[in-house]
Amino acid sequence: VLIIAVLFLTACQLTTAETYSRGRQKHRARRSTDKNSKWTRECTDSGGACNSHDQCCNEFCSTATRTCI
């Protein structure tokens, strides 16, 4: 009887946790989509200063010269 009670309580906790996380995930996804629709991507043309590839319009940043190529 004790084993059945433990299994039942574990199943209830897992079901509650799964339902709760699904609700939060949908809310986060909607919020993230709203933010992304407001943002515009700004990029640096070739020859401009950069620190990472995603800053360059052509998505290539030279690590040696720290410029977009």
From Swiss-Prot:
InterPro entries in the record: Conotoxin
Q: Which residues form the signal peptide?
A: 1-17
Ordered alphabetically, the record's keywords are:
Disulfide bond, Knottin, Secreted, Signal, Toxin
State its location(s). Secreted
- The UniProt entry lists the main location of this chain as secreted
Q: According to the UniProt record, which cysteines are disulfide-bonded?
A: 43-57, 50-61, 56-68
Tissue expression profile of the protein: Expressed by the venom duct.
Name a Pfam family for this protein: Conotoxin
Gene Ontology MF term list = ion channel inhibitor activity; toxin activity
An example GO CC term for this entry is: extracellular region
Q: Which residues form the propeptide?
A: 18-41
Q: What is known of its domains?
A: The presence of a 'disulfide through disulfide knot' structurally defines this protein as a knottin.
Remaining remarks: This precursor corresponds to allele E1b. Has not been merged with other alleles since they may differ due to geographic variation (see strains in PubMed:19606224).
For this chain, the family text in UniProt reads:
Belongs to the conotoxin O1 superfamily.
What is the designated name of this protein?
Answer: Conotoxin Eb6.14
Source species of the chain = Conus ebraeus (Hebrew cone)
The organism's taxonomy opens as: Eukaryota, Metazoa, Spiralia, Lophotrochozoa, Mollusca
